[in-house]
Design a protein with these regions (language model features):
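Low-complexity, intrinsically disordered regions enriched in charged/polar residues
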Residues: 2, 115, 169, 182-185, ...
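Active-site-adjacent loop/helix surface patches within enzyme catalytic domains
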Residues: 2-167
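Acidic/histidine-rich, metal-coordinating catalytic segments
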Residues: 164-179
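Short, low-complexity, polybasic intrinsically disordered segments
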Residues: 177-201
C-alpha cells in the first residue's frame, strides 16, 4: 500500500482501499501535522461512510476503517475534512485545518442491562466483544476494536508519517471535551508512542 496523489493505492493484507465520493470540501489541507482517531458509533463501516459522505451530514472524514481491516477513503489527504469540530490542542483551535481524520467502525461506549451489553442503537454485543474500564470505582463498557483494524490503522498512519511532518496523533476526546472517542478500548498511548518514533527516533 502506498499514497499517490493523496489517495491510498494498492492493497494491504489482501484488501484494496475503496474510494467513496464525498463532495464536502472546505479547501486545501496543505501541511497536516496531526492525525485524529475516531470511532464511528455506527452499525457498520459502509453505512457510516455513506452517512459521512451525505451532503446533508455536517461531518466527514478522510478514511473509515472496517472491522475486517478494509479501508474506505472519502477524501484525498490534501483536502480539509469536517471531523474535529470545535477543537483545541497544543495552542491551536479549529483543528480540521491541520489534521487527517480516521474513523474506525466501532460502536463506542456500551451499556449493560440485565447482564447483556448494548450499543446506543440497541445492538447486543457478546462479552468477548466488550472491553471493561473502571474509573473512580465505576465500570464502563466499550466495544472492542479488532486486531485487523488496529493493524490497518497503524499501517496507514505509518504511510502518513512518511508523507507529512506528523507531530501529533490524538484521540477525538483529547481535542474536545464533547467526545469520548476512540474510547478506552483503543490502545492510544502505546500506538502513539510507537508511531511517533518514526519521525522522532
Amino acid at each position: 500500500m502506498y499514497i499517490e496523489n493523496h489517495l491510498l493505492k494498492d492493497t494491504f493484507a489482501g484488501r484494496s482501499a475503496k474510494q467513496l465520493h464525498c463532495n464536502k470540501k472546505s479547501g486545501l489541507l496543505e501541511y497536516p501535522d496531526m492525525i485524529v482517531l475516531h470511532y464511528t458509533a455506527g452499525g457498520n463501516a459502509m453505512s457510516s461512510a455513506h452517512y459521512l459522505a451525505r451532503a446533508d451530514t455536517d461531518a466527514s472524514a478522510h478514511l473509515v476503517i472496517a472491522r475486517d481491516g478494509g479501508i474506505i477513503q472519502l477524501l484525498p489527504f490534501d483536502t480539509i475534512a469536517w471531523h474535529a469540530g470545535q477543537s483545541e490542542y497544543a495552542g491551536r483551535t479549529n483543528l480540521n485545518r491541520y489534521s487527517i481524520g480516521i474513523e474506525m467502525d466501532n460502536a463506542g461506549e456500551l451499556h449493560r442491562r440485565e447482564g447483556k451489553f448494548y450499543s446506543w442503537f440497541n445492538r447486543e454485543y457478546m462479552p468477548d466483544e466488550v472491553y471493561t474500564d473502571c474509573i473512580n470505582g465505576r465500570a464502563r463498557y466499550w466495544h472492542l476494536y479488532t486486531k485487523e483494524q488496529i493493524m490497518t490503522v497503524y499501517a496507514v498512519c505509518r504511510l502518513l508519517l512518511k508523507a507529512d511532518p506528523i507531530h501529533y496523533i490524538v484521540g477525538h476526546s483529547e481535542i474536545t471535551n464533547r467526545k469520548l472517542d476512540p474510547g478506552a478500548a483503543f490502545p492510544l498511548k502505546q500506538f502513539r508512542e510507537q508511531l511517533l518514533k518514526i519521525n522522532n527516533p
